Amino acid sequence: TTASGGHLWLSVIGFFGVTSFLSMWMSNTSTTAMMLPIAIALVGKEYPRMRAYVVLGTAYAANIGGLATAVGSPPNGIAVSALDIDFFTWFKVGFPSAIMMFPLVILAMWVVIRPEKNAMVNQPGGNNNFSMEWNAHAKGSVALFIFTVFCWIFSSQIGHFLGLKQFDRMIAIFITALAPILGLISWKDLEKKIEWGILILFGGGLCLSVILSETGTSKWLATQMIQTIAGSPDWVVIIASITLMIFLTELASNTGSAAILIPVMMALSNQFNPAITYALVFGVGVAATCAFMLPV
């Protein structure tokens, strides 16, 4: 709110932008949980529609940001694993997708909710501006974050230079171990604050994907689908698959849905038309995070 000069719309759009950016590097669930208290404090109860706009927008902005990178949302990781691509290959498609979706979702919410035009933004902490001590720990954390992003974006080049495969996976483990060694966080805090449930869910999703592929279940399901869509153009297959994933994730876990459908889509594209593999799996992977309609 300080950077926006107290201007309501600049504050709100800026807040959504920060939420999306954080969600590129954190799980969208964690980002939403962290930003919601700030969103609630941003607009008073006397403006209920604007408050609803900001609170819902925070959740949507976190979902949109999660599309941009391979680490932003578990379905992205499942798609990356299935396609055997690196961080930057996903980023080249995911980031533009997130950039295009951001204004569309913000505008659609405004049309539906119609927030009060005279709403005022609250200044957190009253007249006292928020300030953070820019100490060695803060500087070290920012430096480590920039280093991690750099290594992820250029993972292919660095991995080729070092002769290492899947370097983007290795850098994540390396940074996790390096942070407590440098004293930026204690091992106890790391153990307590890591969302182990999400990691287990993600790992379980990858295991389920492998099981479906290795047992031939995904190929059998793909064969049944091909019999239904035989003779359809490629674009019809892609749009139908994306639509199926969007509606499935309205009722089921996006990670679980991605773990089940992505191996099927891989098998489907290999049998139907291998040329559409990347477009189909990218589309389905992105669609898994687009569960905007229902609270579940």
What are these language model-derived features?
Residues 1, 89-223:
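Hydrophobic transmembrane alpha-helices of multi-pass small-molecule transporters
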Residues 2-9, 162, 221-232:
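Membrane interface segments of multi-pass transport proteins and intramembrane proteases
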Residues 5-67, 74-83, 254-287:
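Hydrophobic transmembrane alpha-helices that form the pore/transport pathway of multi-pass ion
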Residues 7, 11, 20, 24-33, ...:
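Transmembrane alpha-helical segments of multi-pass membrane transport proteins and ion-pumping complexes
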Residues 9-17, 31, 55-56, 91-99, ...:
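Hydrophobic alpha-helical transmembrane segments
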Residues 20-21, 42, 149-153, 177-181, ...:
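Alpha-helical transmembrane segments of multipass membrane proteins
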Residues 45-49, 184-193, 249-257:
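Membrane-helix interface "capping/anchor" motifs
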Residues 88-101, 204-208, 229-296:
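C-terminal transmembrane helix pair
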